[in-house]
């Protein structure tokens, strides 16, 4: 294992555990995360050094290593509220992302659990999940009105760049892997951002 990547400013809790298991691995993360971890009071969150930190003003020129850069395309979505690092594993055409968008419900995660033992979401969880599906306009609205609100021009530019990549599969942190019509689903979810308007 050569790299430990925090997919955004929220997905970092187990970096210390991974660094202990793989002490020579380089830690990669978004702007603000090293400082957030330094200020943390949780004993499980260490003070490890980051080898590469993606920043808005240098995101196109940031290099991890020649080997990494040859196989992986990176887009730092600084316009996203969580400061997303989106990866394209070029050899297999796989897009990997944390919170750029969700694909709920997460049926794969519970595929080995009996119906009787599956969690039963309450009203709030059902409402949240309904806005985190790739079908319909709920997630589109959330992305447009809330998630990208802080810097929509930069968010749009990032989404447009990701859309130009050649991928067939999307691996989200939240929800099922998208193995069919990945480009079409991406274009539908981000339609307004790709056009730059609603």
Show where each model-derived region lies.
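Active-site HxH/HxHxD metal-binding segment of metal-dependent hydrolases
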Residues: 1-66
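Short beta->alpha connector loops
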Residues: 8-11, 78-81, 153
């Amino acid at each position: 294992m050569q790299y430990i990547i925090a997919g955004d400013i929220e997905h970092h809790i187990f970096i210390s555990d991974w660094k202990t298991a793989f002490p020579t691995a380089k830690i990669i993360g978004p702007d603000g995360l090293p400082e957030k971890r330094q200020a943390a009071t949780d004993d499980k969150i260490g003070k490890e050094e980051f080898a590469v930190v993606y920043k808005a003003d240098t995101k196109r020129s940031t290099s991890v290593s020649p080997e990494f850069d040859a196989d992986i395309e990176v887009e730092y979505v600084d316009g996203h509220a969580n400061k997303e690092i989106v990866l394209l594993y070029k050899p297999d055409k796989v897009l990997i992302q944390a919170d750029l968008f969700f694909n709920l419900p997460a049926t794969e995660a519970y595929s080995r659990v009996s119906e009787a033992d599956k969690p039963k979401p309450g009203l709030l969880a059902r409402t949240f999940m309904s806005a985190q599906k790739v079908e319909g306009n709920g997630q589109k609205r959330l992305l447009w009105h809330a998630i990208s609100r802080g810097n929509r021009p930069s968010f749009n530019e990032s989404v447009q760049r990701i859309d130009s990549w050649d991928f067939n599969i999307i691996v989200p942190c939240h929800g099922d892997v998208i193995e069919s019509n990945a480009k079409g689903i991406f274009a539908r979810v981000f339609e307004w951002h790709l056009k730059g308007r609603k």
